[in-house]
């Protein structure tokens, strides 16, 4: 479960960074 949460957090950070670059 811990690794699953870490994976979700990592994906959210990557998505946020990509979204910020697109703006």
UniProtKB/Swiss-Prot annotation:
User: Can the keyword Transit peptide be found in this entry's annotation?
Assistant: no
Q: Where is it localised?
A: Cell inner membrane
One Gene Ontology CC term in the entry: plasma membrane
According to Swiss-Prot or TrEMBL, what is its membrane topology?
A: Single-pass membrane protein
- Give the transmembrane region(s): 3-23
Signal peptide residue numbers: none
Checking InterPro entries in the record gives: YpdK
What triggers or suppresses the expression of this protein?
A: In exponential phase, strongly repressed by thiol oxidant diamide (at protein level).
UniProt keyword annotation of Kinase present = no
Q: Which domain of life is it from?
A: Bacteria
Can you tell me which residues the record assigns to a coiled coil? none
Which controlled-vocabulary keywords does the entry list?
Cell inner membrane, Cell membrane, Membrane, Stress response, Transmembrane, Transmembrane helix
Quote the protein name from its UniProt record: Uncharacterized membrane protein YpdK
Organism, per UniProt?
Escherichia coli (strain K12)
């Amino acid at each position: 479960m811990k690794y699953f949460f870490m994976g979700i957090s990592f994906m959210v950070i990557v998505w946020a960074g990509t979204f910020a670059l697109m703006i």
